[in-house]
Amino acid sequence: MDISVIDATKVNAETGLHIGESNAPVKMIEFINVRCPYCRKWFEESEELLAQSVKSGKVERIIKLFDKEKESLQRGNVMHHYIDYSAPEQALSALHKMFATQDEWGNLTLEEVATYAEKNLGLKEQKDATLVSAVIAEANAAHIQFVPTIIIGEHIFDESVTEEELR
């Protein structure tokens, strides 16, 4: 994945799901798609460290659910529409459930994914096309093509980021 073309100055800390204190000194911006296996790996492997950093007030996570045109990621696009951005803790819990059950819903039809989100995960569809469009426009302006893409200040990481690099 070529992250050298990404322009981090085109990324904002406003749009997205905010986890943690808004006055935290470090803003971590994460472009992810919940159907992507590399995003699941990133989410699960970084969760403990990030939870501690958020709890201690050092980091605010801004998670940007990035709808992708790639056929294999379209199921993630459907799931993204079940995240309630107005309730960050519940939204983070929903992301955990989505990643934990990715193997169950990941090959369903798009309609079946929506049903799975409602019946199996107990989620309600959130209609926020403006936010979805804003994340896509932001990613395009910054030349972000792949997920996961993690931006911390001027530093840009992909799925190969290590825990040591995050510290």
Please tell me what each predicted stretch does.
Residues D2-K10:
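N-terminal leader/targeting and pre-domain segments
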Residues T9-K27:
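A short beta-strand-turn-helix
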